[in-house]
Amino acid sequence: MATDLSSSSTLLLSRNCKTPPFYHTTNSLSLSKTHHLYASRNAVVSRLRLLCQTTGSTQSTPTSGVSDLQFAAQVGQHRLSKVPISNIRNFCIIAHIDHGKSTLADKLLQVTGTVQQREMKEQFLDNMDLERERGITIKLQAARMRYVYENKPYCLNLIDTPGHVDFSYEVSRSLAACEGALLVVDASQGVEAQTLANVYLALENNLEIIPVLNKIDLPGSEPDRVIQEIEEVIGLDCSNAIRCSAKEGIGIIDILNAIVERIPSPRNTAEMPLRTLIFDSYYDPYRGVIVYFRVLDGSIKKGDRIYFMASKKDYFADEIGVLSPNQMQVEELYAGEVGYLSASIRSVADARVGDTITHYNRRAQSSLPGYKEATPMVFCGLFPVDADQFPEVRDALEKLQLNDAALKFEPETSSAMGFGFRCGFLGLLHMEIVQERLEREYNLSLITTAPSVVYRVNCVDGDTVECSNPSLLPEPGKRRSIEEPLVKIEMLTPKDYIGPLMELAQDRRGEFKEMRFITNSRASITYELPLAEMVGDFFDQLKSRSKGYASMEYTFIGYKESDLIKLEIQINGDPVEPLATIVHKDKAYPVGRALTQKLKELIPRQMFKVPIQACIGSKVIASEALPAIRKDVLAKCYGGDISRKKKLLKKQAEGKKRMKAIGKVDVPQEAFMAVLKLEKKPWSYKYKMSVNC
């Protein structure tokens, strides 16, 4: 079958031509022109022969007598052949969650022949089990693709990014390593809140943005309406927007051609001293720290002595290579290319994300501007169930922090739970993902305290103290005022749900700022509200009240003084530190009442009566009593003298009194999350802790 390599038709890299899979492609925006093309092994050989001619490679092309493994190896080697820097394109895919980023990345890998059909699976770049189970992207991933356009080979470096607001830091790291971005918008849902946030990040990095309308094959898709939304809300010119269906393979070639035509190539700075920017890294137990980097200036070879400018450490580059998408070794990487590095780095602190790598003997004059430091917004305590696992928890957090630069932690002690760590996260989903990764990847058993935010306490002596742990809040006589963090939240919703969402924001002490209609049927509502009011079930309530149609995006704007107090929980007369929380004075009573009632349901009944109290200082504002389990000590008495029964009842009462004084109350794990009524999965509840009461 003859194949025109210069046309924008789809070429399928398939060895078996008897039952070849197929792709849809279109050379225009009309679905009626969709056609199917089949390519056999001979077409692949022809394409590789063209690559050899255009790159000047002397390696022979695959012949009919080579084996499957040899054939695949030769395909891989041609992907590694060098191309001019003018033929390199670095781009990422940004979008709102569930708009089809990972599916589009899968199809790009498949159409360019980077991944063979038999190796293909859904969410190919999502390596973690958590990502596949939840259907979301958590970690950015990179892949190198080879594409022939107008008889010239191009190297396309793709970086797939997360879509959830909690992982916007991952997106910012991807953008710093690219010159362009594919802005993917669901043609049926339209512009969402995170779409706006990602576009603003891309514009700040001066990226060329290519609008892509995905899922046009759905019956409810409205591409014309969505194009109008993008132009009115974002201000992008969508006259050349690409309409595609990543699932069906429609418009994929148009996207690849647009990447080549519209995204600029990197600057040619190969003669300058080496400067590479680390945009990701992870810890391998056998090879040490593996660094993902983008070469901005100069070139790096295998065996070079390299220097990390921030940590001031030097190593020898034992192995360098590209991600295609699996790691493939090369001898040298030049300016504009993206790759990985292994240098037997054993200390996780020596290769931080955002650091600059240069040559040890020919150092660059200045380091590259690193990333904006991630600011944790939500804090909670992580404690091992087994106190002997404290060193393992510390090592696991250090290794996880290497791969997740937004994670912050410091040691913490609690009279109830012993030694642990106070950890900072970007949001609730980030917190949940980190805890589950610690339990899955490092086999740890953890207890999580209720999440909180960082408060600023202005003391009477003039000092300002930041407090993320309610149990460490200064005494009332030592503090003058308390400031809480504020966020600006933008909710995009159909007009039918404007009322319920405004009611939700006002119930959470929100201050209305602006409302504007994006289209006749969709509106944008802006509020300022305390971050503490969002830490909980705010997102769940937003989805519930809008029947799943609304989306939100928030940004931190600063601190504001507020009338806040510390609410303590006492069980059997003793305070339980992990259950302490900071609340607004007007909400103290309803929160205390709801919390004591919730704890009464969660704490198992004891052999003695257990009082559960919510206190502000020494004042009890809400109280519940957990009744004792009654044992019928008179069951064996069948008549007889009444004094015998009185003696047994008196003995039982004395025993209960003694037990109440020295007894222990088991507080289940879900009690710590009950402070904010978080709905956790069953695996979070399987551990209990004992509080001496």
Curated annotation (Swiss-Prot):
Gene Ontology BP term (one): positive regulation of translation
Catalytic activity: GTP + H2O = GDP + phosphate + H(+)
Primary location: plastid
Disulfide-bonded cysteines: none
SUPFAM superfamilies referenced in this protein's UniProt entry, alphabetically: EF-G C-terminal domain-like, P-loop containing nucleoside triphosphate hydrolases, Translation proteins
Any one GO MF annotation of this record: GTPase activity
Gene Ontology CC entries for this record: chloroplast
Record-listed GTP binding positions: 95-102, 160-164, 214-217
EC code: 3.6.5.-
PROSITE patterns (UniProt xref): G_TR_1, G_TR_2
Record's subcellular location: Plastid, Chloroplast
Domain of life according to the entry: Eukaryota
SMART domains: EFG_C (SM00838)
Keyword presence, Transit peptide: yes
Transit peptide (residue range): 1-51
Occurrences of domain tr-type G (ranges): 86-267
Family the UniProt entry places it in: Belongs to the TRAFAC class translation factor GTPase superfamily. Classic translation factor GTPase family. LepA subfamily.
Protein function: Promotes chloroplast protein synthesis. May act as a fidelity factor of the translation reaction, by catalyzing a one-codon backward translocation of tRNAs on improperly translocated ribosomes.
Name of the protein this chain belongs to: Translation factor GUF1 homolog, chloroplastic
Organism taxonomic ancestry: Eukaryota, Viridiplantae, Streptophyta, Embryophyta, Tracheophyta
